[in-house]
């Protein structure tokens, strides 16, 4: 059972030019992460958790931490879930987080300053990826710049799985980092592996894309070569090799699923 205390959220009272920041966190069975994620976002005026019918203590921990929790079925569409969150707050500025991410103090201070100045811009932030306790510097993990902080009325999300924020505002770099604890257990890794490869195959199938068996055979070795050699995964040691091999398997799995989906048509 989780227990602990949380710092109070930032007090905006008394400011003449009040600009509210909302932090949006999508969750599904994230009891191991949600507490630390919310603690890192204590600079915000509001923290909103959009929960996909978690079966663990995610909702209870989030509510105890001071977040507003809304249950809303994901239905395999991450972009739609993020766009739904836009309708659930009146905040002027939005920061989107994943439950396994943490905001550095420097980034939080920068966002408070930006919200007070209220420029017409969107902000990308550097993400530091940590897999199984190891900070990842190569293998496609850097540079990892995420467009996450922007005025509420200036963004829409697109994409079923690896969704992207779309905005017409100029994009600037935000000082500070997000720390992304991307994988903490192999069970969690393979849960996401299966979920994401299925969703990506479904998205491509729905878009009318096809896959030859030659692609099933040839793309995985190239995916490994790109990750391990071209992107420097070899410099990450044993974990770099393991993740490179699984990256190839990930590539194969999504194309195998697409191949057999189209075979049923």
Segment roles from a protein language model:
Residues 59-88:
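Conserved donor nucleotide-binding strand/loop of the catalytic core
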Residues 24-43:
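Short, well-formed alpha-helical segments that are part of the catalytic scaffolds
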Residues 20-22:
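Cell-envelope/extracellular polymer assembly enzymes that use nucleotide-activated donors
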Residues 25, 44-53, 70, 98-99:
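Short beta-strand/loop segment that forms part of the nucleotide-sugar
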Residues 79-86, 93, 104-265:
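Catalytic-site signature of metal-activated, phosphate-bearing donor transferases
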Residues 40, 51-61, 74, 98:
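A conserved acidic beta->alpha catalytic loop
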Residues 33-35, 56-65, 106-107:
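Acidic helix N-cap motif at the loop->helix transition within catalytic regions
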């Amino acid at each position: 059972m989780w227990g602990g205390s949380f710092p109070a959220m930032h007090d905006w009272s008394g400011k003449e030019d009040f600009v509210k920041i909302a932090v949006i966190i999508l969750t599904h069975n994230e009891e191991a992460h949600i507490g630390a994620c919310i603690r890192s976002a204590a600079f915000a005026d509001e923290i909103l958790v959009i929960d996909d019918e978690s079966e663990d203590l995610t909702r209870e921990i989030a509510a105890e931490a001071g977040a507003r929790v809304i249950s809303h079925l994901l239905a395999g569409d991450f972009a739609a879930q993020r766009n739904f969150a836009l309708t659930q707050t009146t905040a002027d500025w939005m920061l989107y987080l994943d439950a396994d991410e943490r905001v550095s103090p420097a980034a939080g201070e920068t966002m408070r300053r930006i919200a007070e100045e209220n420029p017409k811009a969107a902000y990308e932030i550097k993400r530091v990826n940590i897999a199984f306790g190891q900070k990842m510097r190569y293998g496609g993990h850097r540079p990892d710049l995420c467009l996450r902080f922007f005025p509420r009325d200036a963004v829409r999300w697109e994409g079923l799985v690896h969704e992207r924020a779309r905005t017409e505002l100029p994009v600037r770099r935000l000082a500070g980092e997000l720390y992304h604890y991307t994988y903490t257990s192999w069970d969690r890794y393979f849960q996401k592996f299966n979920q994401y490869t299925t969703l990506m195959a479904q998205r491509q199938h729905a878009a009318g894309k096809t896959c030859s068996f030659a692609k099933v055979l040839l793309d995985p070795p190239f995916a490994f070569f790109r990750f391990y050699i071209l992107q420097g995964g070899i410099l990450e040691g044993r974990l770099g090799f393991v993740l490179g091999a699984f990256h190839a398997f990930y590539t194969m799995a999504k194309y195998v699923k697409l191949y057999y989906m189209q075979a049923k048509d």
